[in-house]
Amino acid sequence: MRMREAEGVSAERLARIAPVMRAEVDKGTFPGAVSLVARNGRVVHFEASGYLDAAKTRPMTKDAIFRMASMTKPIVSVAAMMLVEQGAMKLNDPISNWLPELKDLKVETAAGDVVPTRPVTVQDLLRHTAGFVYGGSTRSPRIKKMYEDLNIEALEKDITAGDMLKNLGTIPLAHQPGTFWEYSISVDVLGLLLERVTKKNLDVVLREMLIEPLGMKDTTWWVGADKRTRLAETLDSDAQKTGMLKSYRHFDDPAVRTYLKGGAGLLGTAEDYLKFLQMVANGGEYAGRRYLSKKTIEFMLSDHIPGMGGTTAASTGPGYGFGLGFAVRAQDGFAWTAGSKGDVMWAGAWGTSFWIDPKENLVGIMMSQAPSNRVQTRMLFKNLVYAAVVE
């Protein structure tokens, strides 16, 4: 019996992925993609489809480098929990312990700005319940304008970490801390907090704690000239391409910047990201080295937002809550794809996505650069993979 069947995955059904990916290339969904599936810690599917470049002249390769955007967030979240395990901070610590620029935050209400009922905590940053927002998605016109005017997200021009925090401290929160889930800059703020805790730049923190020990050799904040030919591109026809390229400036050496976004800054390969995800799927251990305890991983992959307002559905579809750095399937029904209660996922705005299914010991990664079609592609790939799980 071949390995694929031995891992309870049908080789015949996995073979459906390649023609579907080719069809998406032909339809103009993306130039190309890399898809990877592991079951029981073994790779059962790893394919490159289509092309690296927008002109469709260079074949996609398995070692292609992708802008991962928000798939940076789980890595920063794991680093934060490693520091919690080391006693450097606690989840219920106010973030102002390290970020005094944010000690006088107010909360926007219909009756005016009010004092928060409690401080924003480290846990709030990890689970997006701090009251911070993304300017493009918040329902508050006032907060949206303030984020834009004060360059909080550094979308088209850089800002120093100090100025970002100083400016953020003047903007009210959209919700009382710990009451409402709203996708936000929280992990950008968490990255700055990690810098204060460790007294190191965020790129150094992640490199020392996770990237180098895991052997993620192509995971980086910027693409040097020697690897630029491996960078996957977006079709010129993608309506979001121009704006996204302005917002994600990955050809700049981070040494000249003081604000590295913990929520969106990394690039990497599918194979690199599998090492990180497999460590999480293994309960915090990879290749003989322990990064987090089994119980900490279980805690991170639990739903931390029951009873709160807000929903993750725009990114996950229905049926998901949110843990510490990961969306968590809260129940077996309602979701748009097959899966298991307790499976976790997240994705990136450029078109990358992943999930971990602890019950099935299954990890899936889809790497493409198709911001306008990102939800469609992540659901399509997930359906194809679960259709191949037969034991």
Regions found by a protein language model. Give the residues of each.
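Short, surface-exposed beta-strand/loop micro-motifs that present aromatic residues
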Residues: D343-M345, W350-K359
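Short, surface-exposed loop or secondary-structure junction motifs
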Residues: K103-G339
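Active-site SXXK
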Residues: A15-R22, G41-V43, F66-I95, V187-E195, ...
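Short, conserved phosphate/pyrophosphate- and ester-handling motifs at nucleotide-, phospho-/glycolipid
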Residues: S10, K73, T269
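Short, well-ordered beta-strand elements
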Residues: F354-W355, N361-A370
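Short, conserved catalytic-motif segment at the N-terminal edge
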Residues: E5-M68, A88-K90, D104-A111, V375, ...
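Short clusters of small/polar residues that mark proteolytic maturation junctions
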Residues: A48-G50, P94, S368
